Amino acid sequence: MIKLTHISKVFQQGSRTITALSDVSLHVPAGQIYGVIGASGAGKSTLIRCANMLERPTSGQVLVDDQDLTTLSEGQLTRARRQIGMIFQHFNLLSSRTVYGNIALPLELDNTSRADIKKRVNELLDLVGLTDKQDAYPANLSGGQKQRVAIARALASNPKVLLCDEATSALDPATTRSILELLKDINRRLGLTILLITHEMDVVKRICDQVAVISEGKLIEKDSVSEVFSHPKTPLAQQFIQSTLHLDIPEDYAKRMSPEPTVDHVPLLKLEFTGKSVDAPLISQAVRRFNIDIGILSSQMDYAGGVKFGVMLAELHGDVQDGLAAIKFLQDHHVKVEVLGYV
């Protein structure tokens, strides 16, 4: 549905040349939710703006529904954009218009009849759960309600594609979850293709089918969400994944933790499980096989792309050599083991 091929974008700022995107290629299949994740300044927003030609690439090809947008005239591009909805971080609603009026605006600009506008707007109000807010103004809405209005407005022309530019970044966690569930529901019910950019792996984890990681304008990793979470290939992908698992070392442990082993201290381990290692009884097997004890301080498990993954903080008690053998056993079974210190 969306094919970006060898996209590069160069900006000139006085005598400076800034390369925002460098030879980026990705394919978003019809009906899928595709996430692009990266840190601030990585080129995410430039990439998504190239997808509907709000930003014209310096080089490369943009195909949406098999139509090459880079070859179109301004008039042709305006018509093509009717098949591409877009929502933004800051909603961009018209403060002088009601919820109904904001959603109706694209249809009015397209000279749709008043009866058809009313029918379509009422359908969209029902879809986004705002039937009781049609006469309200943006100033009287919460952030989540404003984004729901923006989503409804983006869907007014029955687009085949929805672009989401950091659509949940300005929202609190609970509201973020509700907006993500709405996007997932819209994708499922309408078969809508969604390309979203974000700096939060939690967003990717919750709703995306595939993910690409962008850094300094280059696409450094892309695959299904389950594959990236199970077998991240780049340090940046690993960093984003770790950010979704929030396990802190207890304060009393942190105070007494030593970076070097001593006689009366034991290793404090961070264990990361992905894929099949999550369900396997590896801890109990290691305890029995190597005559050690493992004291679990805390653990967390989650899902991404249908695959379970988890993290655990644990103390390792026993003979040093037995402990090293146990660590190797866990590593051989695809558990990432990190010695955080000695407590």
From Swiss-Prot:
SMART domains: AAA, NIL
Pfam families: ABC_tran (PF00005), NIL (PF09383)
Principal subcellular localization: membrane
Bilayer topology annotation: Peripheral membrane protein
UniProt superkingdom: Bacteria
InterPro entries on file: AAA+_ATPase, ABC_MetN_proteobac, ABC_transporter-like_ATP-bd, ABC_transporter-like_CS, ACT-like_dom_sf, MetN_ABC, MetN_ABC_transporter-like, NIL_domain
ATP-binding is among the record's keywords: yes
Annotated compartments: Cell inner membrane
Enzyme Commission number(s) of this protein: 7.4.2.11
Recorded catalytic activity of this chain's protein: L-methionine(out) + ATP + H2O = L-methionine(in) + ADP + phosphate + H(+); D-methionine(out) + ATP + H2O = D-methionine(in) + ADP + phosphate + H(+)
Sites where the protein binds ATP: G38, A39, S40, G41, A42, G43, K44, S45
Residue ranges constituting the ABC transporter domain according to the UniProt record: 2-241
NAD found in the keyword field: no
PROSITE patterns: ABC_TRANSPORTER_1 (PS00211), ABC_TRANSPORTER_2 (PS50893), METN (PS51264)
Gene Ontology MF terms: ABC-type D-methionine transporter activity; ATP binding; ATP hydrolysis activity
GO CC, alphabetical: Gram-negative-bacterium-type cell wall; plasma membrane
Key words, A-Z: Amino-acid transport, ATP-binding, Cell inner membrane, Cell membrane, Membrane, Nucleotide-binding, Translocase, Transport
Subunit note: The complex is composed of two ATP-binding proteins (MetN), two transmembrane proteins (MetI) and a solute-binding protein (MetQ).
Family listed: Belongs to the ABC transporter superfamily. Methionine importer (TC 3.A.1.24) family.
Name of the protein described by the UniProt record: Methionine import ATP-binding protein MetN 1
Organism: Yersinia pestis
Primary gene name: metN1
